[in-house]
Amino acid sequence: ELYVWTEGFQPGTMQRARIQLNALEKAFVLLEREKVRRIGVTLSFGTVERCLDLVTDAFDAHRFHTHRIVVLLRGQLDRLRSPYRVRGCIDWLRSQQIPVGYRLGAPRASMEMRAIDLVQPDFAKLLAPTSKRPEFWEDVLLEARAAGLRAERVIVAGIETPEQRALAVEAGFGFAQGSAIRPAYDPPSIRTPPTLPAHDAPQAATDDTRT
């Protein structure tokens, strides 16, 4: 997953959209240059709603690599003016064989039913519970199942300790993220090194080389 965040300031809606669109473009560059085999990117509901054409154009421009990317949606439905635009984008992505997931912002799936109904995610991600009680972790996963999410396709994020990892395994989560699973790392560089002229290559005459 290509994860992007800001430090020191809170981006506005359009700033966030530009950041996410740039991240989407970088993800495709990483795929094109074979820096990664598969990659996931996050798009907010607001970005999809306001920049729908730019989002679909990005996928159209890299159609030979769309089968290697997954999209994770997030956001608040209450702020959407046109939910049908988001739903239309989801349907379009799936028509391109692109899996679409949803990141839960609330601690329990029961608090996100409207968003889950809208996205109908192929997979979902939620933050690890703060409780150390195994029963609480099991209840969180049971709620996710009751909401229509498949346990083997629920990612629990924020696993920072071996104890949390053990609780996630015991509860039955399919996947997990966090430093206790694999520490975050910088994405591969996509900068192209400058090309140096060959020693035998002829050079254009300058004031210093003219005779």
Question: What are these language model-derived features?
Answer:
Residues 1-64:
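Bacterial c-di-GMP phosphodiesterase EAL domain
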Residues 39-56, 60-80, 85, 92-93, ...:
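Active-site beta->alpha loop and helix N-cap motifs at the rims of alpha/beta catalytic domains
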Residues 11-15, 80-84, 133-135:
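Short, flexible/disordered intra-domain loops and linkers
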Residues 35-39, 64-69, 96-100, 120-122, ...:
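Short, well-ordered coil/turn segments that N-cap beta-strands
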Residues 5, 74-79, 103-211:
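EAL-family c-di-GMP phosphodiesterase catalytic domain
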